[in-house]
Amino acid sequence: MANPLYKKNILSIADLSRTDLELVVQTASQLKQSPRHDLLQHKVIASCFFEASTRTRLSFETAVHRLGGSVIGFADAGNTSLAKKGETLADSVRVITSYTDAFVIRHPQEGAARLSAEFSSVPVINAGDGSNQHPTQTLLDLFSIYETQGTLDGLKLAFVGDLKYGRTVHSLAQALSLFGARFYFISPEALAMPDYICEELTEKGIEFSFHDTIEEVMPELDILYMTRVQKERFEESEYRHIAAKFVLSADELKTAKPNMKILHPLPRVDEIHTDVDDTNHAYYFQQAGNGVYARQALLALVLNEEV
């Protein structure tokens, strides 16, 4: 079968089909079990982070090195020509992509990755653009879910915390809607899942419901996906009241299925108590580690006709 991701821009999870997603997950699984060190040999990848990042940037760069490639780029846009000399993003992309085989970008502005693709001579991979999309986070989430559940089909998932501004839950809901998931949304009313996501799910015949507490749905879940309630969006007293409702402790896991796993895009603050870390349900650190394999798989597929 031809590789559908070869030379493709990866800008939004909505641009990828069920077949595309399965291919990345299967390739990530293969690379984790049987490492390859030649798939990016003689390839140079631009890693251009206009916004702070730890896990995404380091896992991308690790993925490139482990596949035999090289990385150029920056983690501090303040020292680039864009900041110092007023160069446009379009001009920067034109120049940088003339040096490289792929262009990985994180940018605070929504739509920056799609704009970059208009001026790039090589495939563009979106490593996060504002509150819009973060497709490679979704790919590592899917890989982690598949790794723990043995399937992506027909799973029951709860999303907890900031569902309004959290780009990870938007993309993951869109992706898993292709696999017949059932969703439980648990958040403050002010941070509820956006209408456009709910409308998309309804159009696809995907079941979802809204809840006030995790305990209501815990026995049903295959995956519990926690996110941080962002303190800066509330008054201090209101934040303390809201955040306290969405803190997970080990005691609350007593009714969970034995193989239920907890995921979190990290960083966590107070929303998962440290006593959860030692339970067999905690999988968020392994999830972060899977970022290397998911990004290896994506880079290998985008830059090789056959993998």
UniProtKB/Swiss-Prot annotation:
What protein name applies here?
Answer: Aspartate carbamoyltransferase catalytic subunit
> What organism is this sequence from?
Tolumonas auensis (strain DSM 9187 / NBRC 110442 / TA 4)
Task: Report the Pfam families cross-referenced here.
Answer: OTCace, OTCace_N
Please list the GO biological process terms of this entry: 'de novo' pyrimidine nucleobase biosynthetic process; 'de novo' UMP biosynthetic process; amino acid metabolic process
Binding-site positions, carbamoyl phosphate? R55, T56, R106, H134, Q137, L266, P267
Q: Which is one GO molecular function term here?
A: aspartate carbamoyltransferase activity
Assembly: Heterododecamer (2C3:3R2) of six catalytic PyrB chains organized as two trimers (C3), and six regulatory PyrI chains organized as three dimers (R2).
Provide the residue positions that the database annotates as binding L-aspartate.
K85, R167, R228
Class in the EC hierarchy, top level: transferase
Which UniProt keywords are present, listed alphabetically?
Pyrimidine biosynthesis, Transferase
